[in-house]
């Protein structure tokens, strides 16, 4: 059976709190040659964060609000030591830790109360949960220049708060705790565009497999 929210948090961090936010930034630095993303420089390997002081201030705010921010490292991301767990309410996880604890990535996604993403397809998957989304777009222009997007205007497909700095991250957290959800209708609209059929998954799969 799947682990409960409290069981997963206790297994990973020995932590319980009011809210869980998962941050899944796409990679900017990797060992893959020829990747345009490798030219994007970020001080803390996180968009919207200028330095460690901002992370410390954010950690303090999260502690006051009893929120844990779990930053999931992209498998291709380099120059990032997620083993340095120097914060109380900002915690890093990578594939190795999840495997060690026998926790699937989508179990972690499933227990989160909100998701911070950017240009990653995980935000499309998250629409199925109908929970608040934040899009961290601090390097939007340079990412568009170096990597490019599939859609002509990707912002049309981002039904959530647009985040450009640490202050915006705190606003997202505040809205999450006080129940402010201004993008519910936009998420529903995007859900219909991105997920053609969203009902009776098990029955349709069983019918397809002729069970």
Kindly label every feature range from the protein language model.
Residues 1, 101-106, 144-151:
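Short, charged, surface-exposed secondary-structure boundary motifs
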Residues 1-86, 199-202:
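Conserved catalytic-core segment of nucleotide-activated headgroup transferases in glycan assembly
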Residues 7, 57, 168-171, 204, ...:
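Alpha-helical elements of Rossmann-like donor-binding domains used by nucleotide-donor carbohydrate transfer enzymes
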Residues 72, 95, 136-138:
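Generic beta-sheet signal
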Residues 75-124:
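Donor nucleotide-activated moiety binding/catalytic core segment of transferases
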Residues 88, 121-194:
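Catalytic binding pocket for nucleotide-activated donors in carbohydrate/polymer assembly enzymes
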Residues 197-211:
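C-terminal alpha-helical cap of glycosyltransferases
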């Amino acid at each position: 059976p799947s682990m409960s929210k409290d069981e997963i948090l206790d297994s990973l961090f020995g932590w319980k709190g009011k809210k869980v936010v998962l941050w899944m930034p796409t990679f900017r630095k990797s060992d893959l040659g020829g990747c345009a993303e490798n030219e994007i420089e970020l001080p803390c390997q996180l968009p919207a964060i200028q330095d460690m002081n901002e992370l410390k201030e954010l950690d303090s705010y999260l502690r006051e609000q009893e929120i844990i921010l779990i930053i999931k490292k992209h498998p291709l991301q380099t120059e990032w030591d997620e083993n340095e767990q120097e914060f109380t309410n900002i915690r890093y996880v990578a594939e190795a830790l999840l495997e060690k604890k026998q926790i699937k990535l989508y179990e972690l996604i499933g227990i989160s109360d909100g998701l911070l993403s950017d240009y990653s397809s995980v935000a499309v998957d998250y629409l199925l949960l109908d929970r608040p989304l934040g899009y961290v777009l601090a390097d939007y222009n340079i990412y568009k220049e170096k990597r490019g997007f599939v859609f002509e205007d990707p912002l049309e497909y981002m039904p959530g708060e647009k985040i450009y700095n640490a202050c915006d991250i705190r606003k997202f957290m505040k809205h999450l705790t006080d129940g402010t959800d201004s993008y519910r209708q936009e998420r529903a609209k995007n859900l219909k565009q991105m997920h053609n059929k969203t009902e009776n998954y098990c029955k349709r799969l069983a019918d397809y497999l002729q069970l």
